[in-house]
Amino acid sequence: MIKGVIFDMDGLMFDTERIWATLWKPALATLGLPYKEGLDAAARGSAGDSMRAVLRRFYGPDCDTDAIMDALHAQAETAFQAPPPKKPGLDELIAYLEAQHIPMVVASSSRMASILRHLNNWHMTDHFKALISGEQFTSSKPDPEIFLTAAKALGTTPAETLVLEDSYNGVRAGARGGFFTVMVPDLAPADDEMRRLYTAECKDLREVKKMLEEGELLSEA
């Protein structure tokens, strides 16, 4: 059975991806750069070198990637002063996992300050055994390193660990790491690539809880 659960944060726990999508244009404008169509989708779920690679693809090899990322996070500081809404079923799923004594971690591409802000605003930090940020790694999702580190924090192997993700890059990371990966789509629906990679798809976190209760999420799958 599943012995540990890894939660992504943006778009999975909290309804933040829609807000992030609106921040690119004003962030780039502060640097005199235009927003290029498709940037938000390409960057979603990435950080560090993975994000830098996306930015270079859109703005050329000589663009100041750190300045762009800093401008984006400066916009986020204002946008996320108020707690973002929790995704449906989050509280119920966490309560179920705690009742089953299944440990949980958050592994997000976001900066640690952002992770702490959202969790603290909702008084949720104590539910998780560890909080892991993409800024801790040179390579972020779709590289599986962040999830492999999370599994070590849980004391589980990838095969007995459930990864919950909404983004394409997150699903890619889970699959590459050998995790039991469930996609809960947010802004982008599952495509053929995602259906080849994920173990299962759920419409929301309530459905994840139901599948766990009914024994449908087995590590042997």
Task: Tell what function each PLM region has.
Residues 1-3, 95-98, 111-221:
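Asp-based, Mg2+/Mn2+-dependent phosphohydrolase catalytic module
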Residues 48, 108, 112:
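Functionally critical, cavity-lining and gating residues within the transmembrane helices
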Residues 42, 107-109, 164:
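Structural motif
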Residues 2-100:
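N-terminal helical cap/lid subdomain that shapes the substrate entry/recognition surface
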